Regions:
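Cell-wall polysaccharide-cleaving catalytic domain and substrate-binding groove, primarily
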Residues: 15-202
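Hydrophobic alpha-helical topogenic segments used for membrane insertion/localization
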Residues: 6-16
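Positively charged n-region of N-terminal signal peptides that target proteins for export
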Residues: 1-5
Length: 203
């Protein structure tokens, strides 16, 4: 039994076959067509929204995309978490009143006010890390939450990889190589952790 098979069996043991069948490595439900690195070209359709969301090649690349997306929206919103979250949830037309933006955000999301208030509190307590974790909680069912949040190394790695701008076709494997071989590791908190069952050929 090779290393990859061992990992699959471990994931199935921890999370069950039904959960693993619905893991798309997209903890933030990033829409198809955003062209983030790590996208596989495949997608899944939201049962309630009917929208198409990207499948990523690893949880790390999905988390990287979430960090990049949130950082972009926070910059555009000048640090206003409420405004950034409205953009994240689809109420991104600056010409609309705040009431209309909430209404648009509610088109494909439940309890938008509660969602945003939890996000604001998480950001106040833990900054962008808390915000990302809260989004993962809001966007996923309990079992899928565990898949991401019970693996802090994936979150740490995704965050580190998020400092790099990468072409949309870049895989997790190649993203790790770019990070390891450049100046990123020394400037931004050390090397990213490799999966011992994969060969990244990175020194």
């Amino acid at each position: 039994m090779d290393g990859k098979t061992v990992v699959i069996f471990l994931l199935l043991f921890l999370y069950g076959t039904e959960v693993m069948a619905n893991i798309y490595n997209n903890p933030g439900n990033i829409l198809l067509g955003e062209n983030f690195a790590g996208e596989t070209g495949k997608y899944y359709t939201g049962k309630k929204t009917g929208l198409r969301y990207s499948v990523f090649d690893s949880p790390e690349m999905g988390i990287r995309a979430l960090y990049q997306d949130i950082r972009s929206k926070l910059r555009r919103s000048k640090g206003d978490v409420e405004d950034a979250m409205l953009r994240y949830l689809g109420g991104d037309n600056d010409k609309d009143s705040k009431k209309d933006r909430y209404k648009k955000a509610s088109t494909h999301n439940e309890d938008v006010e509660g969602y945003i208030q939890r996000a604001i509190k998480a950001y106040e307590e833990e900054g962008e890390d808390g915000l990302v974790k809260q989004i993962i909680k809001n966007e996923n069912k309990a079992e899928a939450q565990r898949y991401y949040l019970d693996n802090p190394q994936s979150i740490t790695t995704g965050k580190k990889l998020a400092i790099m701008d990468l072409p949309s076709g870049t895989s997790f494997e190649n993203a790790v190589k770019v990070y390891q071989q450049g100046e990123y590791g020394r400037k931004h908190g050390g090397r990213v952790m490799n999966d011992p069952n994969k060969n990244y050929n990175a020194q």
